Amino acid sequence: MNLSNYYWYFKSALRPKFCDEVIKYALSKREKFALTGGVGRQRDLNNKPLSRKEEEGVKQKRNSSIVWLDEGWIYKEIQPYVHEANERAGWNFNWERTENVQFTKYKLNQYYDWHCDSCDNPYKNGMIRKLSMTCQLTDGSEYEGGELEFDFRNYDPHMRDESQHLNKAKEILPKGSIIVFPSHVWHRVKPVRKGVRYSLVAWHNGYPFK
């Protein structure tokens, strides 16, 4: 699917106080080792811990800590921006619900390699991920590395080089910035070289495209 806009952003959209409150609240919770879909994102590691091979497999793709949040005051802040981006970017995807929000902590050398958030196999409720959102909780001056990068992949590989289809989302470095994008768009978080990067991620689900 070729798109006119592969993401839509809102610079410094959320108040710094809100960002600080989310960080404080999330850090008061017990964080978890971030998983990938291959081993089950909702897997209970207390009852079914990863084998050494599984852990190594996850870390080839992803290395970070997360906290799941299901708080109305957070949804109230972020959802209007998702609706606005969906309309202004021209996607006009029909979506019904937001999954639990993921607070993510990237420390030194932590990352999330290339992936997309959606697949054609619906959840049990019959829905798929349609729109993804990331909120920058820490200012870009507070850490180094950790760039959110997109691969639009709308190119003929024999005609174009990598520099023409990779895009670093520098627009969202200021604290409180929000970026929304279709969940099938490939993206990654590059390794953090200094400091800690905190972000808030949410997925907005709807019934499969027809």
What are these regions (language model features)?
Residues M1-V180, H184-K210:
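Fe(II)/2-oxoglutarate oxygenase catalytic core
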